[in-house]
Each structure stands twice: as structure tokens, then as C-alpha cells.
């Protein structure tokens, strides 16, 4: 067994594919951000009051995944801080990871130098301490809240209301907020008071086109790979695939990185179209696994009902048929089933995630119905459900 490990490690150590793999990872912020000059300029203009020691307006940054929102924000704030570090301090928080109001306030306090116990203090007390700490500061505090929609959908917008009210409560303009979201419609669901405070300035990041993605990939490939490893054809294919997926630069970079890893495992000296196609399958499998494994319990059960029903009937299912299979599964594992209306909503949600297809069809005098089918690899779905939910996994033992 150790011989196999030694052989693999030896092969990888001889690889001449990657010069620096980390330059292709999502959290890497390059020194150049091509095709985002307009957004960089706009963000610098909005934040320019910091040069005078004044609080800039709050900013909402919109754009689909992989359009450069986070990279540009981190880049601009970091560069400004290098030039005028005495004027402001900044804290970056990804609210999908730091996903409760308590942890957000705790993170803010810890970044400002205060120690916070993991539990035992109320959110209200944390907020009081936060206000007190900010008042002690001389510089302006810039708070970057990334994926802000994830937080609000889970816990509401009370924490945003508190943060936007902080300046009023202190009697001083000390806190500026930059909110970043993938959901362009998200702001419509905010309390009007939060909406007006947060949306003082707005910047929209459009998707990249294929030519822009090619340029981004070429620049990054020059740094990340050894010379002559990546051909123009490989770059063009990665860019074309990502351009079809709403111009997602993150997807393009992931595709190029995973293609390099596939080539490395194959012992190849160069990346090929075949490596890109293999990487595409691998990434899609990983994406499906991640999405399915994090679904709520009843969404997983409905999805499993679709898998079982389609296999049994050898055809697409109606919404009613999905509900019938779902209720039988719920009864088997001893859980109370949700209503047919809720199952219909779950089907729509799974369709939006791209896990299933739900097509409305007209059946004449029988009226309209939905034809439901699985849109991804069945084995990956079953693996994600069974490994992440023991209660549903018990169905396999019955």
C-alpha cells in the first residue's frame, strides 16, 4: 500500500504542469483585474471621502456569481488602506460562512481587538459593546458584508438595520457598509428603512463575455502554469463553457485548474481538450453533491421521491405522482409529510437549482400539469443524500 502512495507522490513531484496552482483558486486576488476598470473607478470614487477622514456612502454591489464583485471590492479596499491606513480600518465578512447576527457582531469585535466568548452574551449586549468599541476608534470603520442575501434569507434584516442605525446611535458618522450580493432582486425584500440606508450608492457588475474570459484565463495561465503547458484551444474552450454559464470567471478558472489537475494525474505534459471535458464532468459532479447535501430535509426527501418514481415508471412524473411517492417515503421513516402545495414549491426550487426539470404541459381536457424529471447524475444524488442524512439513508436498510 505504501508503495502505491510513494509512486503517486513521486509522479506528482515530477509534474511540470503547475508553476503555482494557488493562483487559480477563488480566494486569490490578482494585482490586475482586467475588464473591471469602470467598476474599480466607480468604487474608488465612492470611497474617496476616506481620503479626508470622512465616512463614504453605503454601497450595494450587485452581479451574478463570478463577475468579479468580491475580487474588485477586496482589491480596492486593500489598495486604499495601503495608502491611507490612518483614515480607516476595514473588516471583510462572508455572511454565508459567518451566518448568524451573533457571529457577525462577534467577528467585528474580534477584528477590532476585543475578545468575545463563543456563547453566553446576548446579541443586544454584543451590539452595545460594538457601538462602544467603534466610538473609541479614531478611524472610520468600513464593513464589507459578502453574500449578504444568504444572511437575510436565513435570519432577516434586523442585523443590517442595527448596523445602518449605528451612526445615528453614536451621533457620529463612523461606520460605512459595503453589501455584496448575487441576487439582483434581493433588495426588494428588505425593510424600506434598511433599503434606503444601504442603497445610497449602487454598482452593477455585468457578466464577462467569451473574449474577456479568454483574456483573463491567458493572463492567469501565464502565472499558474509552466510555459507551453496550456494551448489557446484549451483556453478558448474553458472561456466558451463559462461564457454560456452567465459569464462566470470563477467557473472558467475552476475549469482550467481542475483540467490541470486531471492532466497531472494522467502524467501528461500538456493540457488537452479531453482534460477539460473530464474536468467539466468532475466539477459538475462536485457541484451537484454540494447542492444536494445542503438541501433541507424535506427537499431531499422530495428529490429522492423523484429518483425512485422515475426509475419505477420509466418516464417523467406529474407533481401528484411525486407527492404520492414522497408521502410513502415519509411514512416509512416515521416523519410527518408536508402539504402537496409545499411539495409543489419544493419542485420549483429544485428546478431553479438545476437538479431537476419541471416542464408545464397541457393535457387537453385534463388541464395543465408539470412533467418532472431528474436533470443530473442519479448516483451523485443518492450518494449526497445517503451520506449526509442518516434518517433518509435508513430507507436503504428497509
UniProtKB/Swiss-Prot annotation:
Alphabetically list the UniProt keywords: ATP-binding, DNA replication, Nucleotide-binding
- Which SMART domains does its entry note? AAA (SM00382), Cdc6_C (SM01074)
Q: Which GO terms describe its molecular function?
A: ATP binding; ATP hydrolysis activity
- The UniProt annotation places ATP binding at 67-71, 208, 220
Pfam families in the record: AAA_22, Cdc6_C, Cdc6_lid
Regarding protein family, the annotation reads: Belongs to the CDC6/cdc18 family.
Function, as annotated, reads: Involved in regulation of DNA replication.
**What is the protein's name according to its record?**
ORC1-type DNA replication protein 1
Amino acid at each position: 500500500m505504501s508503495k502505491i502512495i510513494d509512486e503517486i507522490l513521486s509522479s506528482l513531484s515530477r509534474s511540470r504542469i503547475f508553476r503555482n496552482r494557488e493562483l487559480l483558486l477563488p480566494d486569490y486576488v490578482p494585482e490586475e483585474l482586467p475588464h473591471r476598470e469602470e467598476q474599480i473607478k466607480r468604487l474608488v470614487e465612492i470611497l474617496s471621502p476616506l481620503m479626508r477622514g470622512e465616512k463614504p456612502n453605503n454601497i450595494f454591489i450587485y452581479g451574478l456569481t463570478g463577475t468579479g464583485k468580491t475580487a474588485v471590492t477586496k482589491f480596492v479596499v486593500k489598495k486604499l488602506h495601503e495608502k491611507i491606513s490612518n483614515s480607516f480600518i476595514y473588516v471583510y465578512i462572508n455572511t454565508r460562512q459567518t451566518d448568524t447576527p451573533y457571529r457577525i457582531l462577534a467577528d467585528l469585535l474580534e477584528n477590532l481587538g476585543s475578545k468575545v466568548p463563543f456563547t453566553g452574551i446576548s446579541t443586544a449586549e454584543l451590539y452595545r459593546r460594538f457601538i462602544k468599541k467603534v466610538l473609541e476608534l479614531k478611524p472610520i470603520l468600513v464593513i464589507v458584508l459578502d453574500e449578504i442575501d444568504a444572511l437575510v434569507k436565513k435570519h432577516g434584516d434586523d442585523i443590517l438595520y442595527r448596523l445602518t442605525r449605528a451612526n445615528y446611535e453614536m451621533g457620529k458618522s463612523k461606520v460605512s457598509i459595503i453589501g455584496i450580493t448575487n441576487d439582483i432582486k434581493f433588495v426588494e425584500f428588505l425593510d424600506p428603512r434598511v433599503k434606503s440606508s444601504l442603497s445610497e450608492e449602487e454598482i452593477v457588475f455585468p457578466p464577462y463575455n467569451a473574449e474577456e474570459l479568454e483574456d483573463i484565463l491567458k493572463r492567469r495561465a501565464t502565472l499558474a502554469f509552466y510555459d507551453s503547458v496550456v494551448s489557446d484551444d484549451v483556453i478558448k474552450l474553458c472561456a466558451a463553457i463559462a461564457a454560456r454559464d452567465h459569464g462566470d470567471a470563477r467557473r472558467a478558472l475552476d475549469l482550467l485548474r481542475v483540467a490541470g489537475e486531471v492532466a497531472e494525474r494522467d502524467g501528461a505534459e500538456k493540457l488537452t481538450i479531453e482534460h477539460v471535458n473530464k474536468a467539466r464532468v468532475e466539477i459538475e459532479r462536485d457541484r451537484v453533491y454540494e447542492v444536494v447535501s445542503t438541501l433541507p430535509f424535506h427537499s431531499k426527501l422530495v428529490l429522492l421521491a423523484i429518483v425512485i418514481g422515475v426509475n419505477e415508471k420509466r418516464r417523467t412524473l406529474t407533481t401528484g405522482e411525486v407527492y404520492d411517492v414522497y408521502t410513502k417515503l415519509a411514512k416509512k421513516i416515521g416523519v410527518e409529510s408536508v402539504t402537496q402545495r409545499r411539495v409543489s414549491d419544493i419542485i420549483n426550487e429544485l428546478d431553479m437549482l438545476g437538479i431537476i426539470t419541471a416542464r408545464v404541459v397541457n393535457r387537453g381536457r385534463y388541464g395543465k400539469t408539470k412533467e418532472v424529471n431528474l436533470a443530473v447524475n442519479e448516483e451523485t444524488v443518492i450518494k449526497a443524500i445517503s451520506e449526509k442524512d442518516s434518517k433518509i439513508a435508513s430507507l436503504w436498510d428497509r
